[in-house]
């Protein structure tokens, strides 16, 4: 997996959100996760349809997964709640998605370094959170030990994306730990100019990536 920056939607609807998402794509965003837990299927469909169709293949959805097939999105995300609710349902869902859309990706969320040592059932990448104190969730604080986190990241079979409190100032630490990428939420949506902030983070990430590869 190439090192990448992912943006995840806020759970609440925000002013000019679709315009911002389109501008993020125009400025280099490769993957956008839509996390709107209160949306109905139709609300999710309408949200996606407001995003330029040429970017639909960069969208991953956290609910109403059937839309991944009908709209031909990039993939689906399974939350911890999905996996705990019914052990077999996520497995069947993964098989169905892979049958209908062999090119679709499947991702998941974990919240403990020990989870990284489990068998990978076929996720393209997973989020581990919160790596730092969350910006978007008040009181959602990092409880990880840095040493155990680095060890787990070296041993894991997962492609692990850092989520939670990641902003411009944390990018060097994300690289140091050994993550395959980072996901941005509050650092984008809780700023006055989300697009400018994304560009600043995106440019610094690429600069760090190029300095490592030289």
List PLM regions with ranges:
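Non-cysteine beta-strand/loop elements that form the S-adenosyl-L-methionine
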Residues: 124-132
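A short acidic, helix-capping loop that chelates divalent metal ions and anchors anionic groups
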Residues: 132-138
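Conserved N-terminal beta1-alpha1 strand-loop-helix module at the mouth
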Residues: 1-87, 91, 98-125, 151-158, ...
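Short, glycine/charged-rich "phosphate-handling" switch motifs in NTP-dependent
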Residues: 180
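Glycine-rich S-adenosyl-L-methionine
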Residues: 145-150
């Amino acid at each position: 997996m190439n090192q990448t920056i992912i943006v995840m939607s806020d759970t609440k609807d925000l002013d000019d959100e679709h315009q911002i998402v389109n501008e993020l794509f125009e400025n280099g965003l490769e993957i956008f996760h839509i996390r709107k837990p209160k949306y109905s299927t139709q609300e999710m469909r309408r949200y996606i349809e407001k995003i330029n169709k040429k970017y639909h293949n960069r969208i991953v959805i956290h609910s109403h997964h059937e839309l991944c097939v009908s709209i031909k999105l990039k993939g689906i995300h399974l939350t911890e709640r999905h996996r705990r609710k019914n052990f077999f349902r996520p497995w069947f869902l993964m098989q169905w998605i892979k049958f209908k859309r062999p090119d679709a990706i499947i991702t998941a969320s974990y919240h403990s370094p020990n989870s990284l040592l489990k068998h990978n059932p076929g996720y393209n990448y997973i989020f581990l959170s919160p790596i730092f104190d969350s910006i978007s969730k008040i009181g959602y604080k990092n409880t990880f030990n840095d040493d155990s986190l680095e060890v787990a990241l070296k041993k894991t079979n997962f492609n692990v994306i850092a989520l939670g409190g990641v902003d411009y100032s944390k990018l060097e630490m994300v690289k140091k730990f050994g993550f395959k990428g980072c996901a941005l939420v509050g650092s984008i949506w809780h700023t006055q100019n989300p697009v400018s902030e994304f560009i600043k983070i995106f440019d610094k990430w690429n600069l760090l990536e190029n300095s490592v590869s030289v």
